Amino acid sequence: MSDPEPPEAELPQPVAGFIAAVNAADLDALVATFAARAMVNDQLCEYWDKPGITAWAQREIIGQRLCIRIRGVVRNHEQTVVEAALDGSFDKRGLPDPLIVTFYFSTRHDHLVQLVILRNESHD
């Protein structure tokens, strides 16, 4: 039996493009993955449309040198849920190591229309 495909193989193009752009610190490529009227909710703060998303990405993604390491992927209808370990230059005091967050991507017509980012609590 062959080895299973890596989680990246399961990703729709806009999700794969977003993660690649984050890891490459490529702001233009990151913003290009979003539809014009998209929304990002990052830890309960909302950013709408390309200008809002661009400002958020510059500050929170590029400015913090964020790096995403995928741990798991679940597809649910038009949504892709990615559990990932995050690293970067952000203040890590009080955060678990590794920092695990869940990205909830909604896509339409080859663009991200909604992204919700949460640090979920363990059920243990």
PLM feature segments, named:
Residues 22, 34-37, 60, 119:
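Alpha-helix boundary/capping residues
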Residues 28, 36, 113:
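Glycine-centered loop/turn positions within well-structured domains
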Residues 37-48:
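A short gly/proline-enriched turn/hairpin at secondary-structure junctions
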